[in-house]
Structure formats: C-alpha cells, structure tokens
Amino acid sequence: MGGALSTDGAEQRASSVEELNQRLAHRFAAKCFEPLELTHLKENFFSRALDQHGIRYWNEEILSEFLGIPDGAGSAAAATSDGSLDAGPVIFRMVSYLGAFPFQNTMAPTVLTFESMVKVVVLLTERYGKVLKRGKKDRMKLLFGSLADVGRRDIITVLKEATEDSLESIGPSDPRSASPSTHNTGFLVDQPVNDEDEEDDDDLAIAALESLDAIEVFKHDQRIDKTVYESKISLTTFRRLLTLLLVTAPLRPLGRVSKFTTGLSKPSLDAVHEQVDSILAALDPGEASDGIGYKSFSKLVSTSLPYLFDPLTPLFEHLLFSKNLDLSRKRDSQTTNGLTSKPVPTPPSTPPLSPPLSPVISTGGFDSCILNPALLSHLSFFVSTNVHIPNIFRNRTHLHPVFSSTEHGESLTSFSHHVMTWQAPSILLVRGAVVSESSEEQLTTIGAYLPQPWKQTSSYSSRRSSEAPDPSTLPCLFELSPVHTVLQGSPSFSSLKSNMPVTHFSTKTGIAIGCMIPPSSRKSFGSDLHPKPAGGGSLLIDSALENATFIVSNGLNGPGVFLPPGISPVLSSTSLTASVPSMSSSNQNFTKSISIYNLEVWGIIPSTSLATQLDGSGSPIEKRDAISLQRAQWDFEAREAERRQAINMKVGGGESDAQTGRALLEMAGIIGDSYYSGHHRH
C-alpha cells in the first residue's frame, strides 16, 4: 500500500511538472513573441517534425539541417575537412538542456517538442530578458549548464536514451501498472546532491513559475541543478562552439548561415583557429585537461567577452520566419465557413527587409595587413560602439582605413597627418614579434579601442559615480593573440589627474596609451620626459614606430585609465578596490617588448540612422561625417602650408629670415611639436 501511494505520488508530481512545463511554454510564447512570429515558428516546426506515438519532435539532424550548422552528418556535413566546425552535437546538447527549463533536474535532456523549442528560442536570443529575473546572470548559468559535459554520464548516450524512453512511454499502457514516467531521470550532475547557492538557483526557476501558482510543486521535488558548479565544459566542446561563433559572428537577421560555414579556405580556417586558441589560452592552464569550471567560464565571458553569444540571436531567429507560410488560404477558408475573425496579415514570400547592413570594412584606402574576418569577429565579442546595440556587426558600424605603417610609412609625421585629423572613435592595431631571449619568434597582436578623437585626450565628460557606465564610451586595451586579454576602461575618469590622458602623442617620445605623462620643464632630461605606465595596463610606442611595450600590471602602478584584467567596469569602486590586492598576487603581471611589423588605425563610423540627431522642432540636424571633416582639415592644412610659404618669401627667403619666420609660426602654434600634442587647445 505504501508502495502504491509512493508510485501515485510520483506520477502525480510528474504530471504536475509536465503540465507546468506546457503552461510555462505558453507563457513564454505570449510574452516574448508577436502573433505572426509564433505562427511562423509553428509552421517551421511542425512541417519538419518527426512523429512517434503522436508526439511531434525534432532530432539533431533536423535541427542542424534547418540552422545550417555542420554536424558531421546530413547535408551540412563535410563543411570543413578537419571537422572543427561540426558544432551540431554541441548545439543539440544545449537545446536539449534548455528545453527542459526550469526542470533540468528531472526533465533534461528533453525531447525537442514544440513547447521545448519555444523556450529554447527565448533563452538563446535576446528575448531572455523578459523572462529571466536577473537577465545575463541567470542566462550565464543556463548556458554553462547546457554546455557542461565533464562530470556527467556520456552525453550522447543520455540524449539517445532520453529520446527513446520519453517517446516509448507515450504508448498505450495499463493505468494500474507502474508504467514508466513520461519524463527521464535527467543528467547525473543535475541530481540535488548539495545545496550550495540553493536560494540563488531556486530564484532562477521561481521567477519563471511565480505567475503559475506552482512554486510549492517546484520546491517540493524539482530543485534546479545544485551541482552545476561541480560540472565542467570540456575543451573540445568549447572549442567547437567558439569556432562556430567566430565564423557566424557577421550573420545578419535571416541571413544564410551556409554562407559562413561552407567553402572556407585553409588560410581562413587557420585564422579562425588562431583566435580560438587565443581565447582558450586565457583560461587557467590546468583546465585544459580537466575542463572549464563555472567560475572561470563566468569570469571570462562577463569581463572580457560580453558579446560572445550574440551570434546565437540571428541564428535561432531563423525559426521565426518561414518561406512556405501562406496565411491567405487559412483566411479564405475561414471566410467560406462563415467564421468571423480578425484579418490575418499575409506574410511576404521573401524575408522582411531589415535595415541594410553596410560592409563592416569600408572599401578604398589600404589593404589591411592585420584585420581579417576572424580577427574582426573576435573584436565584436568585446568592443562596444553603440549604447543601444553594442555589437559592431549588428549596429552597422563602418571601419574606415585611417593609417597604415605599410601604406603611409613608419613616420610620426605621417601618423599625425592621418590620425590627428580623424575626429571620431578609432581602433589601434599593432602586429609584431615579442622580443625574448629565445630564438623562436612569437607573433602577437595588440590594440586599443579609443572612443574619443586623439586630440581630445582629456575631454571625457564628467559623470556621476552613481550612473552605470556605458561600455561604448569607455576605452579598452587588449591583446588578441597569442593570449586573449582585455583591460576595460575605468569608469572613474572624473577622478583621474590631468596628466593621465587616454592617449598622448609627441614627436619626441612617441605614442602613449593609458600612461602618466611627466610634466615638462627645463630641468627634465632623457628618461624623465618619457610617459610612465599607470593603472591596470599601458601601451607605449616609440617615435620611430619600430618598437612597442605592452604592460599589464593588475593595478600595481596605482590608478589609471584601464582596469586590471578580469574586472568589469560595472563593479563599484568599493568592490574594485577590494579585488585588486587579491589579483595582484596572480601571474598576470607582465611586460612585452614588441618589434612592430605593422601598425594600423581604423576609424569608426556609426550608422547614419543611429547617429541622426533632432533639433528642438523634431527636424533632423544635418551632420558632417568624420571623413568629410578629415578632408576639410587636410584642405585647411594645405592652405596653411601655402600661407607659411608666402610668409617665408615675404621675409626675404634668406636662411636666417626663414628661421625667424619659422620661430614666429611656432610661437603662434601653427607648426611644431605642440601642434600635435593632445593637450593643445585651439
């Protein structure tokens, strides 16, 4: 009798969980999708779904084929010869886990029914903010749990067994017998072995269930993933996911995925692998064999790769548009039967026109020796150029060629002519070899994102400390290879001293980024005039553009423009101060001396539509873009050169007279080193 009661109770709880799961999926759909989007999703799903015992579901092959992801099988196979892009199993593992939300304990991995797919699309696109209580923090846990495959049973076996068991259990059975439950036992790692962070984890699911009057059922038997922090992501799994994200980073809404995943040349794949290796090198070396833990994963993504998962949004939004959907037939049928209903809009036969995405790299100028599609994708994972749409691919940012040492020469005069006249944000890139005692050459790529023009080095607007920093207004210093390193800009610009500009330019000492500039005086000689490292990191380039010094100090050099690695600008000043001493004992303090091969500056031009400003009456203000402003500055300099030549001729043309004329021009600030100084005021 006791056994019967136990069985009945378990079946009742299982039924309650499945009922809640369906209700939650309906709530997700109503809250996160437009009616037409939901109609497209239904058509896409049910037109391809398999049927077993009345259950409609997708398997891995259908999912990979629809998304256009290589998986080593089916039509998307053999996209690359080395199999590095075979991310189908990884994506299928993720959706099988996320489809069980918030019942990963007893339902993951789940069969990909329509209800499961609804939750997957919400959680893997930017719609997740409408249903997750703490937004990115909650999503981080879910993404990690969906990828974790170390410390679990064989993941592929579990997925196959789960699908078979769940489908077979739907068949006819004797209601008096102890039939198999309609849900599987889940991953071993999801069994509630411990209660660490229990309240925090429960909140994640309770936030989704609080409107369904189901919290007590959840607390009774469906505790969410208490051991997610004990599981890990294997390096192979993370490598395949990174490869897919790097390749598909430029994917536009409703764009063809196969355009990026097929036909890749060996040099293109090698460039992708270089960026993948760089990101993996940022992890603790000990995790290479044991797997990536939650803390390392969360820290890496939140502090230096905040936009890593952005490509998943356009990828899974493909499910929200069907080329085969024709609602006109349904509308005609309803009219014929005499049914009254609201007019149903007929979707177009082609994807709806989204704002055209301009090429990320503008044509003309010079051919880059540094930038390539893989490196550009890497940059898009952490560089923000717009407050509303941070991702450089999605906000239609242009990269305009401003300066190249290969094209324009290794000269500070040429650098100042091209860069100091660029009145817009820019990205500095340096490619070279690390100078070391070993004979083996190690190439490195470093750079900086500078949201303000070079001349306005100390003109950052003051901001109250209580306001959240906007990443698009903060500079960042970074290393792209061989080890991914990002030093975020400090949000406390108002507290920095005037001798600590973001950028400093001098024909005598060269280029300095994130340094303290010593005051010039008649008693200062030699090294006393050179910029000094400050804050979490600095970059110095000599006046010949031949050598660079990249310093990462973890804050040992006091306050500065950049934060130590692993710290996000969103941290409060209190938590930042407390975290610096603990990080200073790490091994991330280093100085790299670099022999420069190529130095490039790329100007950032925001989309015209995003940059439009309105006057008081609501009319658009005519603006001149950075390219026009630069050309106007060059024209002005040309006229000034002619005027200086005319002055010299009027003086008399003699050598002494020419020197006198030059002295007058220098005192007027028209020529000379002070003209190019970041501290000069016009």
Curated annotation (Swiss-Prot):
Q: Where in the cell is it found?
A: Cytoplasm
Q: In this entry, which stretches build a coiled coil?
A: none
Bias (Pro residues) ranges: 344-357
- What is an example of a Pfam family matching this protein? TLD
Where does the TLDc domain start and stop, copy by copy?
369-605
Q: Where is the composition biased (Polar residues)?
A: 176-185
Q: Name one GO cellular component term.
A: cytoplasm
Q: Where mainly found?
A: cytoplasm
Domain of life the protein comes from: Eukaryota
Assigned keywords, A-Z = Cytoplasm
- Tell me the segments the record calls region Disordered: 166-200, 331-357
Any idea what job this protein has? May be involved in a process influencing telomere capping.
Q: Report the sequence similarity comment from the record.
A: Belongs to the RTC5 family.
Which protein is depicted?
Restriction of telomere capping protein 5
- Species assigned in the record: Ajellomyces capsulatus (strain H143)
Gene name, per UniProt, is RTC5
